[in-house]
Amino acid sequence: MKPPDKGLLLSSYVDFTIPSPFAREHLYYLIQYRRYQCVPGYEVERDFLDMYLCAYVRSGSLHTFCGEQSANATAGQLVLMDCRLPHRYYVTEPTEFLWFHFSGGESAAYVRLLTGGTGICFDGNHEILQYFEQIFYYGDKQVYNEHRISVCIQSVLCCLAVPDTKPDIPEVIRPAVEYIAEHFREDVTLETLAD
Protein backbone atom coordinates (compact mmCIF):
# COMPACT_ATOMS: atom_id res chain seq x y z
CA MET A 1 0.00 0.00 0.00
CA LYS A 2 1.40 3.41 -0.95
CA PRO A 3 1.45 6.02 1.83
CA PRO A 4 -0.42 9.30 1.24
CA ASP A 5 1.79 11.50 3.44
CA LYS A 6 3.35 14.69 2.08
CA GLY A 7 7.10 14.44 1.51
CA LEU A 8 7.13 10.68 0.88
CA LEU A 9 8.60 9.33 -2.33
CA LEU A 10 6.60 6.78 -4.30
CA SER A 11 9.17 4.09 -3.47
CA SER A 12 7.97 4.18 0.16
CA TYR A 13 5.56 1.51 1.33
CA VAL A 14 3.31 0.71 4.28
CA ASP A 15 2.01 -2.61 5.53
CA PHE A 16 -0.16 -3.63 8.46
CA THR A 17 -0.64 -6.80 10.47
CA ILE A 18 -3.57 -8.08 12.49
CA PRO A 19 -2.15 -9.77 15.59
CA SER A 20 -3.99 -12.80 16.92
CA PRO A 21 -5.61 -12.72 20.38
CA PHE A 22 -2.73 -14.90 21.62
CA ALA A 23 -0.14 -12.42 20.34
CA ARG A 24 -2.00 -9.47 21.86
CA GLU A 25 -2.03 -11.17 25.24
CA HIS A 26 1.38 -12.86 25.36
CA LEU A 27 3.81 -11.57 22.71
CA TYR A 28 5.46 -8.43 21.43
CA TYR A 29 3.47 -7.81 18.29
CA LEU A 30 3.84 -5.83 15.10
CA ILE A 31 1.10 -3.37 14.18
CA GLN A 32 2.48 -1.72 11.07
CA TYR A 33 5.83 -1.42 9.39
CA ARG A 34 7.27 0.76 6.70
CA ARG A 35 10.25 1.71 4.63
CA TYR A 36 10.16 5.40 3.99
CA GLN A 37 12.15 7.47 1.57
CA CYS A 38 11.23 11.07 2.18
CA VAL A 39 12.19 14.64 1.40
CA PRO A 40 11.74 17.90 3.30
CA GLY A 41 8.04 18.43 3.94
CA TYR A 42 7.58 15.01 5.53
CA GLU A 43 6.31 15.45 9.08
CA VAL A 44 4.20 13.50 11.57
CA GLU A 45 2.74 15.07 14.71
CA ARG A 46 0.36 13.36 17.12
CA ASP A 47 -0.85 13.83 20.66
CA PHE A 48 -1.44 10.13 21.28
CA LEU A 49 -1.16 6.78 19.54
CA ASP A 50 -1.49 3.65 21.70
CA MET A 51 1.71 1.93 20.54
CA TYR A 52 5.48 2.30 20.38
CA LEU A 53 7.72 3.34 17.49
CA CYS A 54 11.12 1.99 16.57
CA ALA A 55 12.85 3.65 13.58
CA TYR A 56 16.27 2.92 12.03
CA VAL A 57 17.76 5.72 9.94
CA ARG A 58 19.57 4.38 6.86
CA SER A 59 20.49 7.75 5.35
CA GLY A 60 19.85 11.42 6.06
CA SER A 61 18.49 12.43 9.45
CA LEU A 62 15.24 12.21 11.39
CA HIS A 63 14.40 15.00 13.84
CA THR A 64 12.31 13.59 16.70
CA PHE A 65 10.45 14.84 19.75
CA CYS A 66 8.65 12.63 22.26
CA GLY A 67 7.29 13.96 25.53
CA GLU A 68 10.13 16.05 26.99
CA GLN A 69 12.86 14.35 24.94
CA SER A 70 14.26 15.22 21.54
CA ALA A 71 16.96 13.87 19.24
CA ASN A 72 18.34 14.19 15.75
CA ALA A 73 18.98 10.64 14.56
CA THR A 74 21.44 10.27 11.70
CA ALA A 75 22.41 7.33 9.48
CA GLY A 76 23.04 4.21 11.55
CA GLN A 77 21.07 5.45 14.54
CA LEU A 78 17.76 4.28 15.92
CA VAL A 79 14.88 6.12 17.58
CA LEU A 80 12.60 4.51 20.17
CA MET A 81 9.44 6.40 21.16
CA ASP A 82 6.42 5.93 23.38
CA CYS A 83 3.73 7.20 21.02
CA ARG A 84 1.27 7.49 23.91
CA LEU A 85 3.12 10.73 24.65
CA PRO A 86 2.85 13.75 22.35
CA HIS A 87 5.37 13.16 19.57
CA ARG A 88 6.63 14.66 16.36
CA TYR A 89 9.19 13.68 13.75
CA TYR A 90 10.25 15.24 10.47
CA VAL A 91 13.09 15.46 7.94
CA THR A 92 15.02 18.45 6.59
CA GLU A 93 16.98 16.54 3.94
CA PRO A 94 16.40 13.43 1.81
CA THR A 95 16.14 10.60 4.33
CA GLU A 96 15.49 6.87 4.29
CA PHE A 97 14.38 5.03 7.40
CA LEU A 98 12.84 1.71 8.36
CA TRP A 99 10.28 1.73 11.13
CA PHE A 100 7.63 -0.27 12.85
CA HIS A 101 4.92 0.27 15.43
CA PHE A 102 4.69 -2.42 18.08
CA SER A 103 3.07 -3.23 21.40
CA GLY A 104 2.48 -6.17 23.73
CA GLY A 105 4.76 -8.10 26.01
CA GLU A 106 6.55 -5.74 28.35
CA SER A 107 6.75 -2.94 25.76
CA ALA A 108 5.92 -0.14 28.19
CA ALA A 109 8.49 -1.28 30.76
CA TYR A 110 11.21 -1.81 28.16
CA VAL A 111 10.65 1.56 26.48
CA ARG A 112 10.70 3.31 29.89
CA LEU A 113 13.90 1.49 30.84
CA LEU A 114 15.65 2.31 27.58
CA THR A 115 14.57 5.91 27.11
CA GLY A 116 14.63 6.90 30.77
CA GLY A 117 18.39 7.04 31.07
CA THR A 118 19.85 7.72 27.65
CA GLY A 119 17.05 9.40 25.73
CA ILE A 120 15.20 8.30 22.61
CA CYS A 121 18.16 8.00 20.19
CA PHE A 122 20.57 5.04 20.12
CA ASP A 123 23.50 3.96 18.02
CA GLY A 124 22.47 1.10 15.79
CA ASN A 125 24.55 -1.76 14.48
CA HIS A 126 24.48 -4.46 11.83
CA GLU A 127 22.71 -6.88 14.19
CA ILE A 128 19.82 -4.47 14.81
CA LEU A 129 19.43 -3.84 11.08
CA GLN A 130 19.18 -7.61 10.53
CA TYR A 131 16.39 -7.82 13.11
CA PHE A 132 14.52 -5.04 11.32
CA GLU A 133 14.82 -6.95 8.05
CA GLN A 134 13.58 -10.14 9.73
CA ILE A 135 10.61 -8.28 11.24
CA PHE A 136 9.69 -7.00 7.79
CA TYR A 137 10.16 -10.47 6.27
CA TYR A 138 8.00 -12.25 8.86
CA GLY A 139 5.42 -9.46 8.71
CA ASP A 140 4.79 -10.24 5.05
CA LYS A 141 1.43 -11.93 4.54
CA GLN A 142 3.01 -14.86 2.67
CA VAL A 143 5.28 -15.86 5.57
CA TYR A 144 3.59 -14.12 8.51
CA ASN A 145 4.93 -15.53 11.79
CA GLU A 146 4.01 -13.55 14.89
CA HIS A 147 6.17 -15.71 17.17
CA ARG A 148 9.33 -14.94 15.19
CA ILE A 149 8.28 -11.28 14.98
CA SER A 150 8.00 -11.20 18.77
CA VAL A 151 11.49 -12.66 19.16
CA CYS A 152 12.91 -10.12 16.69
CA ILE A 153 11.23 -7.15 18.43
CA GLN A 154 12.56 -8.35 21.77
CA SER A 155 16.00 -8.82 20.20
CA VAL A 156 16.03 -5.20 19.01
CA LEU A 157 15.11 -4.05 22.52
CA CYS A 158 17.76 -6.34 24.00
CA CYS A 159 20.43 -4.89 21.69
CA LEU A 160 19.49 -1.42 22.89
CA ALA A 161 19.56 -2.50 26.54
CA VAL A 162 22.98 -4.11 26.19
CA PRO A 163 24.93 -2.06 23.64
CA ASP A 164 27.66 -3.74 21.64
CA THR A 165 30.35 -1.76 23.44
CA LYS A 166 32.60 -2.51 26.36
CA PRO A 167 32.97 0.10 29.08
CA ASP A 168 36.25 1.96 29.21
CA ILE A 169 38.33 0.62 32.05
CA PRO A 170 40.55 3.23 33.69
CA GLU A 171 44.24 2.53 33.05
CA VAL A 172 45.00 2.43 36.77
CA ILE A 173 42.82 -0.67 37.32
CA ARG A 174 43.21 -2.36 33.90
CA PRO A 175 46.03 -4.72 35.09
CA ALA A 176 43.89 -5.90 38.01
CA VAL A 177 40.88 -6.54 35.76
CA GLU A 178 43.04 -8.48 33.30
CA TYR A 179 44.58 -10.53 36.12
CA ILE A 180 41.15 -11.43 37.49
CA ALA A 181 39.96 -12.44 34.01
CA GLU A 182 42.98 -14.72 33.54
CA HIS A 183 42.84 -16.24 37.06
CA PHE A 184 39.11 -16.32 37.78
CA ARG A 185 39.21 -20.01 38.78
CA GLU A 186 41.86 -19.36 41.43
CA ASP A 187 41.69 -17.70 44.82
CA VAL A 188 42.59 -14.08 44.15
CA THR A 189 43.59 -11.95 47.12
CA LEU A 190 43.64 -8.20 47.45
CA GLU A 191 47.37 -8.37 48.14
CA THR A 192 47.95 -10.16 44.82
CA LEU A 193 45.97 -7.52 42.96
CA ALA A 194 47.84 -4.71 44.72
CA ASP A 195 51.16 -6.05 43.41
In which residue ranges do the predicted regions lie?
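Short, conserved beta-strand segments within well-ordered enzyme catalytic domains
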Residues: 55-57, 63, 79-80, 98-101
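Ligand-binding loop in jelly-roll beta-barrel domains
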Residues: 70, 83-107
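ATP/adenylate-binding site constellation spanning eukaryotic-like Ser/Thr protein kinases
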Residues: 59, 94, 173
